[in-house]
A protein has these predicted regions:
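Short, C-terminally biased terminal segments at protein or domain edges
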Residues: 1-19, 23, 27-90
Length: 90
C-alpha cells in the first residue's frame, strides 16, 4: 500500500512538471512565465524527494533509482537555469 501511495505522488508531481512548463510557455506575462517555471521547479524537487523515499524503502532498485534520479536532477538543473535567466531578464 505504501508503494502505491508513493508511486501516486511521483506520478502527480512528475506530470505536474510538464503541465506547468506548458502553461509557462503560454503565459500572459513574464511574471506568469516565471511563476509557472518556479512551480515546475518545486514539483521536480518534490519528485526527487519521493524517488529517494521509494529507493530508501527498497521499492525500486539501485539501478532504477540512479537512472531516474539522474534524469530528474537534469530537469532540476534546466529549470533552475530557466528561472535564474528569467529573473535576470525582468
Amino acid at each position: 500500500m505504501k508503494e502505491y501511495v508513493m508511486s501516486k505522488q511521483i506520478l502527480r508531481c512528475g506530470t505536474s512538471i510538464g503541465a506547468n512548463v506548458k502553461e509557462a510557455l503560454r503565459g500572459q506575462s513574464k511574471a506568469d512565465f516565471r511563476a509557472k517555471m518556479n512551480i515546475a521547479l518545486k514539483e521536480a524537487s518534490e519528485t526527487e524527494y519521493w524517488l529517494e523515499l521509494l529507493h530508501e524503502s527498497d521499492y525500486i532498485s539501485e539501478e532504477q533509482f540512479q537512472s531516474i534520479i539522474a534524469d530528474n536532477i537534469e530537469i532540476i538543473k534546466i529549470l533552475t537555469s530557466i528561472v535564474k535567466n528569467s529573473d535576470n531578464n525582468v
